[in-house]
From Swiss-Prot:
Residues 30-67 are annotated as: Disordered. The keyword Coiled coil applies. This is Basic leucine zipper 8. Residues 45-108 form the bZIP domain. It is found in: Nucleus. Pfam families: bZIP_1 (PF00170). A motif (Nuclear localization signal) lies at residues 48-55. GO terms for cellular component: nucleus. Residues 47-68 are annotated as: Basic motif. Residues 37-47 have a biased composition (Basic and acidic residues).
Amino acid sequence: MAGSVYNLPSQNPNPQSLFQIFVDRVPLSNLPATSDDSSRTAEDNERKRRRKVSNRESARRSRMRKQRHMEELWSMLVQLINKNKSLVDELSQARECYEKVIEENMKLREENSKSRKMIGEIGLNRFLSVEADQIWTF
């Protein structure tokens, strides 16, 4: 009986292998549908529909959050650009002031040097005390 019509194994098959052969041979569409199956299918369809609606709503909320986040980032970008511009302007003003102070300092040193030279030429060095002379030293 090795080659039976149903291609069943000839040696004592176990129930699981017989069931697997049956499942492989008989399409599920050929099985009769019961009322439980149809109500379960309706429930499954309703669950799928609710899940689809829920997923769409979740995706919409996610897009809205992303859009709000992008708007916040753009707002921050504008603020940071403005802050950067004001800092660059402030730095430029500070550099101008620094250059003016350096220039003024150089003028004062030259004036000090000329004054000391004139004092030396006039011979007033003898009237200056050592402490006063140290004031002019840098």
